[in-house]
Amino acid sequence: LLMIIDGSNLAHRAYQKFENLKASNGKKTGLIYGFMRLLNSYIIRFNPTYVLVTFDTLQSKSSNFRNNLLGGYKEHRKKNNLSMDYEQFNYQLRSVKKMLKYLNITVIWDNKGLGHESDDYIGKFALESKGKVLIISSDKDFCQLIDDRIKVFNPFRDMKLNKRNCKDVMGYSPEECVDYLCLVGDKSDDIPG
């Protein structure tokens, strides 16, 4: 089993959940603690053969080619996260990446600033893998990848999505996912329908 973790998704979840956690020296450590705690729980729960963690680039969203296609792409996130301490977030995220490296967990991210997101790498590796794949993310876009080999675990729902239950849970099948999102849009990414 290849377990692919949407590291950006997990990092934001950990940062928000443990935002006030600090080390004895006063430095914030909530993202680090939360990320490693959740990662450990997924490894214990799903017992993967291999773990891959992907991240969005730390660079500005303006360099993302998606902004050239749709000017308002993810615009509300910038407005909603004005109070977020990005310097602290990025510091902790760099620490998480170092820890993953020491644990021999493969980390993939756009270190060349090409505008690729974590999602791009998840899709690529899930589709290219020959064996079973479990994607860990709350991002509904991954439902389109679900088939006999690929499943998605949504941590917010604490539920594994597969071909049998996707339509009941999400309201659309994996084959209908792209059409559905094109029709209704995606508020989380500021994409109109």
Regions found by a protein language model. Name each.
Residues S137:
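Short acidic/histidine-rich active-site segments
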Residues F18, A126, N165-K167, G193:
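Surface-exposed beta-strand edges and their flanking turn/coil or helix-capping segments
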Residues L1-L134, F142-K160:
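Noncatalytic, basic helical substrate-engagement surface that gates or grips nucleic-acid strands
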Residues K140, L183-G193:
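Helix-hairpin-helix
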Residues R157-D186:
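A short, charged helix-loop
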